[in-house]
Amino acid sequence: PKVVFERPKHRGRMWKRAWVDAVDQLISWTEMFRLVQNEGLGMISQGTREWTNYIVRADVTPHLATRAGIAVRVQGLTRFYALMVTRDQKVQLVKSLHQESVLAESEFGWSFGDTLHMSLGVDGDELWGEINGQVVLSARDSSLDSGAIGLVIADGRSATHKVEVTKTD
């Protein structure tokens, strides 16, 4: 895949319907998306099951959230890999296969309202996550081999202006 998702310049709203919406509120404010999830984990996703090896890049600005980030190989709300920052100053590479497990974790200092330029790549069984241009985590897992991309939020809200998906070389 090679695609960029940005808020269109026109005032139409149909473009939002191309996203699978599984959050309490999905608002187009000054940013393309403002995701609000009052309790638990929520996600919006876009793409196809045929997407295999790619990198997703997005700006993520968490506000009063327990976790926020981006997801790859999304096959539903309980089947995905995600790169997320947590309220307790960590970054996690998470696998959700009907139950969540942390594949890799590290300390990562950030503040609410910071815009984090996140990317998560998958190629075969390799996963790697970057924040602000620095590789922060990597892991290997072959449980999910394809799927869409997503924006993830837990117990709070986050904002995103642009999402880009490119095929790995």
Identify the meaning behind each predicted range.
Residues 1-169:
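Extracellular glycan-recognition regions
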